[in-house]
Amino acid sequence: THPRAFGNFARLLGKYVRDEKVITLENAIYKLTGLPASNLKLKKRGYLKKGFYADIVVFNPKTINDFATFENPMQYATGVNHVLVNGTHVIDNGNHTGAYGGRFVKGPGYKN
């Protein structure tokens, strides 16, 4: 397993936004949300808008960190407080609720 499988977003937000200031928080969030949704033509995703699916991550920019390494890749990131997938609360105060709100999302290139 590659370490970024466990801490890719946290690495961007912790190391490159907060610590090294290589990218702004606003630009990083756009690159993690709106940009890929737009590029993949995913309807009603990637933005906080009325009528869009409620895919929301609440994190603390001061504490978000990744810990995964090549030697020990299966280390969860910290600083993510809440996650809602399609409006379903799946992470509550950093703990999985047991709920699964995800579903298969078809992009424009999907063929049966």
Residue ranges of model-derived segments:
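Short C-terminal domain-edge/linker segments immediately following a structured domain
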Residues: 21-26, 86-93, 112
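His/Asp/Glu-enriched, well-ordered alpha-helical/loop segment
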Residues: 1-63
